[in-house]
Amino acid sequence: MRTLRQIAAVSGVAFALAAASAAAHAEKITIMVGGATKIIYLPAKLTEQLGYFKDEGLDVEILSQPAGVDAENELLAGAVQGVVGFYDHTIDLQSKGKEVQALVVFGQVPGEVEMVSTKAADSLKSMADVKGKTLGVTGLGSSTSFLTQYLAQRAGVPSTQYTMLPVGADNSFIAAVKQGRIDAGMTTEPTVSQLLKTGDAKVLVDMRNVEGTRAALGGTYPASSFYVQRAWAEAHKDEAAKLSHAFAKTLNFIATHSAEDIAAQMPKDYYGNNKDLYVGALKASLPMFTKDGKMPADGPDTVLKVLSAFNPSVKGKHIDLAKTYTNDYVSAPVKTASK
């Protein structure tokens, strides 16, 4: 007669094989990330590394696109099923007649930092000093461009009095600072920590935490998120729920583990030869993440306020914020991450 231990062992193997089989037969889901190595989008790759997609029986491919605007275009073209990018794209797209909704909110704040070049720091001590300056953004029409304009406006400087230059992110942003092509610019970790370490730039506005974001924007600003076309979610409710559960488990993992633990899960090419710098950047960024993937109550209104000020597509339009996100898929109980 079999012992309980033998039965449990056989059952465990059977379950593992069943999960592997389910993933093998699952329809591939492709997710485009607006810059996969950015820490604001950390949950995308971390979910894959932790095996949470496979645990849900999903076959997910993560692709990277430097700018969120381009990732959005891939989604609308049907080339990818989901995007990890800024929540504000869902509002912008609704103004253009496209129904896209965020299923999981990663960041309750932008995680963005306005950095000022050390060369320009003496004459640029706040956003009130950007008149006549060149400000770097990832791309024109990007989330960073709207945030930059809003910060300047709050400081009393209209968008006609400075220049925005699209310089991308990561190494291209660093090059723009070093070459003196921009006086200041908006970027994220780990680029922020790299510039601080080399002494090429200083922090001007810090939106990596709730306090700094409320001071800069007047409220929380949900940013990094996982969004899909509304029609896709309704036609693939099971997959949408499983994806949301996988991401929610990752957010729980982030909330319950140290920066060192998280960094240990990431591929080496995410931190290169400077793991300590990456861990430091992670520590500075951890407060930005939600613990459960749900939309902060005051978030959508703040985002709409920013977009209504500078996005010509949104300005003057009626936006139904309730259609830009849903907590339905992450509301179901999710097992606590223990890996």
Task: Write out the residue ranges for each language-model feature.
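Pocket-lining segment of extracytoplasmic ligand-binding domains
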Residues: 172-267
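Secondary-structure end/capping motifs
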Residues: 233-314
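Conserved C-terminal helix/tail region of periplasmic/extracytoplasmic solute-binding proteins
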Residues: 304-339
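N-terminal signal peptide c-region/cleavage motif recognized by signal peptidases
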Residues: 16-21
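Bacterial N-terminal signal peptides that target proteins for export
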Residues: 1-11
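Short, glycine-/small- and polar/acidic-enriched structural segments
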Residues: 28-167, 176-189, 200, 204-205
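Short, solvent-exposed loop/beta-turn-alpha elements that line the ligand-binding surface or hinge
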Residues: 126, 209-219, 286-296
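Boundary at the C-terminal end of the N-terminal hydrophobic targeting segment
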Residues: 22-26
